[in-house]
Design a protein with these regions (language model features):
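Short, ordered loop/turn segments at secondary-structure junctions
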Residues: 11-13, 34, 39-45, 77-78, ...
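A short, small-residue-rich loop immediately preceding and capping a beta-strand
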Residues: 5-13, 18, 96-109, 175-176
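Accessory alpha-helical/coil subdomains and C-terminal extensions
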Residues: 36, 93, 101-106, 112-116, ...
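Glycine-rich oxoanion-binding loops at beta->alpha junctions
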Residues: 1, 46-102, 110, 134, ...
Length: 260
């Protein structure tokens, strides 16, 4: 197969380390005699047939990129319906740009996109995916975490430690919700490292639908146990995936609860 351009595209939400991946991938490719371009704006311009949102990546441009935050190529979140509707346009745009090798940087959704592109290309485009997500919900060989997770965990730990001091000083409880989508990796990582009083993650509950009362009883029990020990304060870490498991019919019975 004729070696055309290597393309790099970022999908999904932001996470620490994106520019470092762009930089290292581009430098390695250039040192092997390849030309590299970045797609500015994630998959959105590709889905719209835009061939102008292309940034040539040179060593001068990316050599210090790893020291900066964010993404030089920006990113986008694309609805599954729009992706399916305009997927043929995306494939045609990649071909027009001249990309024969594609590096996708993103989480679970971008991983599926990479798979679809590889299947649709039928050997005309090689695809490599760099797993990026603070959720750490992509299983990797050797138990490695996805990039972005460790930094998010570290930052979260520092925040929780400060809140724990407020909790102790004020004699009150704080409930903290962490990101993580359907998984509790980030919540558990932060909770363990910070020494939070209690951490609730969805993996602890085998039932498909979690009773709101059950979750509330667990948190209430933790508060009561602390009081029996003479401690009137604490910090609970709650993974956002817990809310995904709640029975909405049960929640409707609690009129005073604001449902986000």
């Amino acid at each position: 197969m004729n070696k055309g351009l290597i393309g790099i595209v970022v999908g999904g939400g932001p996470a620490p380390g994106i520019n470092g991946v762009i930089s290292s991938a581009a430098i390695e490719a250039i040192n092997h005699g390849r030309k590299v371009v970045g797609i500015v704006g994630g998959f959105k311009p590709l889905l719209e047939g835009d061939t102008k949102s292309v940034l040539p990546l040179t060593i001068d441009l990316v050599s210090r990129l790893h020291t900066t935050g964010g993404s030089i190529l920006r990113t986008s979140r694309d609805a599954p319906g729009e992706v399916k509707k305009h997927f043929k346009t995306l494939m045609a745009t990649l071909k027009k740009i001249g990309i024969t090798d594609l590096i996708t940087i993103g989480g679970e959704g971008t991983l599926f996109m990479a798979k679809w592109i590889e299947q649709e290309a039928r050997g005309t485009i090689n695809v490599v995916h760099a797993p990026k997500t603070i959720d750490n919900d992509i299983p990797l060989p050797g138990g490695f975490s996805t990039f972005g997770y460790q930094t998010a965990r570290h930052v979260g730990v520092e925040i929780v430690k400060n809140i724990m001091e407020d909790s102790r000083t004020m004699g009150r409880w704080y409930f903290i919700t962490t990101m993580g989508r359907y998984t509790g990796h980030l919540a558990l990582g932060i909770g363990k490292a910070a020494g939070a009083t209690i951490t609730l993650i969805p993996e602890e509950f085998s039932e498909k639908r979690l009773s709101f009362k059950k979750a509330a009883d667990i948190l209430t029990g933790s508060i009561i146990k602390r009081l029996s020990m003479g401690r009137d304060h604490g910090v609970a870490i709650i993974a956002e995936g817990i809310a995904e498991k709640f029975d909405m019919e049960e929640l409707a019975k609690y009129e005073d609860i604001e449902i986000d």
